[in-house]
Amino acid sequence: MQKDTLKPGEAPVRAAPHTPMMTQYHAIKAEYPDTLVFYRMGDFYEVFYADAEKASSLLDITLTKRGQSAGEPVVMAGIPFHALEGYLAKLIKLGESVAICEQVGDVATAKGPVERKVVRVVTPGTLTDTELLSDKTESILLAVHQGARNTCGLAWLSVTQGEIHLAHCANGELETWLARIAPSELLYNVDATPAFEQRLQTQRCAASARPAWQFDAALGVRRLLDQLKVASLASWHAEGLNEAHAAASALLGYAEHTQGRALPHVQGLQVVRSGELIELPPATRRNLELTQTLRGEDSPTLFSLLDTCTTGMGSRALKSWLLSPRRDRAQAASRLEAITQLRSGAQQTLRTQLKGCSDVERITARIALRQVRPRELVALQLTLQKAELLTPVDSAQIPLLTTIFEDLQPPLGCAELLGQCILDEPAALIRDGGVINHGLDAELDELRAIQTNCDGFLLDLEIREKARTGIANLRVQFNKVHGFYIEVTQGQLDKVPADYRRRQTLKNAERYITPELKTFEDKALSAQERALAREKWLYEQLLDQLQEFVPALSRLARAIAALDALCALAERSLTLNWCAPVFVKEPCIAIGQGRHPVVEARLAETGGGAFIANDCSLTGKSRMQMITGPNMGGKSTYMRQVALIVLLASVGSYVPASACRLGPIDAIHTRIGAADDVANAQSTFMLEMLEAAQILHAATPYSLVLMDEIGRGTSTFDGLALAGGIAAYLHNKAQAFTLFATHYFELTEFAAQHHGAMNVHVSAVESGSDIVFLHHIEPGPASKSYGIAVAKLAGVPAAVVNHARHALAALEAQQSQASAQVDLFAAPPEAPASGQTAIDKALASIDPDILSPREALEALYQLKKLASAA
């Protein structure tokens, strides 16, 4: 402990206080300790201290020190206010959150620092600004609450979409749910267990722990009731979901906090139950390259192939359909029905008419949140006019299209109101003025007239002053810094009248003001300020009037999105020559001449030749295919195309095949590819076994399972034994539809011993020492492995290839001499009988507590003798 060194009578030195402005800053920063605070000062947003150091590093802006506060230099960095959106985009991409602190007080009347407050908090999961959002991807905020009974509750929403989702799941299903939701930002209870928190941290999104009191189920119910303006959640079947209600409490509280206001446009609620959706685990989404390639790129993927939508709303709807197919066939059947109707020619006309439509969904959210920009309102007006002209489709027998076209009707009077209030080409921001239409408000028109007449007055004054003073090059001008002035060059200063008052001295001229010009300046500048204030007030009044249109605009947005997505699927089905799947009740996957849609498209783009189509038939009696054949022969492509066709059909799309019959499906599981997870200290083989274990626990008779080269991450015998055991489990226990590709030729015996399995192979032809891949799936096992031929094709040196051929011949000769054969698929041997052995009896007779050292040694020799005899 430090001793007091003050002398008697000496007063302690007090720390210097913060300046008034920094006192204000620290008070605001205390409310947002984990968030970068952008503090508005004039034409800049400033960041201070640790925030400044962080922003300087992330944004590559200059870090400096200015003045002192509390006896210490003020570390700071800044950005121009007009460049805010660009810097926000960078920070959001890095997972940061930013509190925007604006000047809300009047600078002219402020005593001390002008009043400031945080008007919004921009976070990765609560974005509403179109400049910060991807057209094709939702920004989703997710709250997760760990329950007490091995369950967790989830609540999520896209602030721009306006619908809350609730779900319960078992802890073991959490990764699948997280992959399905794909949140941009995740909230969890600070009291969550370390293991639970670690599972959440694996998500590549911003994650933050929130106080435990925010996860309150009763508060969540109240917030949901208030948000939806209802007295009960019964109509949504959302009662009794305590963990999800707790998550909803944190979700809504956080969303309102970041927006700085209520969310009036959020009026939808959907309870998503585990058994309603076809399960697509993270490995399936990754291996099938639904929205990202294995390299993390956006193209070529299934979504990039399908997405010919003309609007961002349509693209987002299509992606949502693709990632959340339902087990219930009603939704898929209704989409198929609509697509079939649109294929008749209507899709081409509608796609042309939809082109250029604005993002009504996001503009509507920004209207509700009072953040909408003037030019967005002009874009909305044009879209409303387009919607009125959309060509109706004969949808009398198509309920989905009937609903869509009913909702496509623009709200009455909305377009007219926007046209009446907003200029055709307004300024980008209301703060700049030049937004409100002429003739709307007499007071604004009068103030604008004063500004308009300004040029005429200045020209007239200049002519008069030239005549009065005899200064031919005299100029009457204006700038924002010094206001109005009369400029006289150095050579004419002797002619300046006595009533001129010097305003500014330049190198080659002087600037003056006269009483007449000063009077006009006061009037003109006052008119400008008053006109801007009037425009802002009128704009707020317009936003008030637009609130009543929000529900209808939300319906219109959903209708445009659905129609656009359906038209895109109709166009794809025609352009790519796809067929309509047929849904049946009996268990089956029957595909005629199926193709991998993405590979086929890439071959067409690159001139790589025609794609080789293949049939696939899996039924209740024949559920498993054992697939053999050379690497590069097309096994993985065939397996993936079957899964993609099943997925597309389940979404309600046409499929790349000549025919398709599909029974009920509850999940698509894949075990494909190999890579170490170094960050989590998991080897290739461990990851392989983890994925296999998850599949074996989850697969049912309604699941489609793809197993590609299981067991290759360990020794040959280990791998072969494991592959045989996994195949037997999938056949006997899970009874799932299974495509089982293997490089173990021994597994071709599996079909002979299991009635529900069949052998197929990808064909290839050898010509001398060369190999030609035919890519056809044919009945029966492969006649041989072509690994050495593939190695030669890959460019392995000839010496290595020749050595491998000789070694292979020797190994095959050695194998043919072995007489014993192991039955890989026999039932496990029974455990040995539990009767006591001689060793057991001897051990039972020994009491170690009473043995002398010599007796203990004798007993040990006796046990060793018994063990040798056994």
Curated annotation (Swiss-Prot):
GO biological process: mismatch repair
GO molecular function terms attached to this record: ATP binding; ATP-dependent DNA damage sensor activity; damaged DNA binding; mismatched DNA binding
SUPFAM superfamilies: DNA repair protein MutS, domain I, DNA repair protein MutS, domain II, DNA repair protein MutS, domain III, P-loop containing nucleoside triphosphate hydrolases
Entry GO CC: cytosol
Entry-linked Pfam families: MutS_I (PF01624), MutS_II (PF05188), MutS_III (PF05192), MutS_IV (PF05190), MutS_V (PF00488)
Entry-linked SMART domains: MUTSac, MUTSd
PROSITE patterns, alphabetized: DNA_MISMATCH_REPAIR_2
Listed InterPro entries: DNA_mismatch_repair_MutS, DNA_mismatch_repair_MutS-lik_N, DNA_mismatch_repair_MutS/MSH, DNA_mismatch_repair_MutS_C, DNA_mismatch_repair_MutS_clamp, DNA_mismatch_repair_MutS_core, DNA_mismatch_repair_MutS_N, DNA_mismatch_repair_MutS_sf
Entry binding sites for ATP: 629-636
Keywords per UniProt: ATP-binding, DNA damage, DNA repair, DNA-binding, Nucleotide-binding
Top-level division of the source organism's lineage: Bacteria
Family statement drawn from the similarity comment of this UniProt entry: Belongs to the DNA mismatch repair MutS family.
Function: This protein is involved in the repair of mismatches in DNA. It is possible that it carries out the mismatch recognition step. This protein has a weak ATPase activity.
UniProt protein name: DNA mismatch repair protein MutS
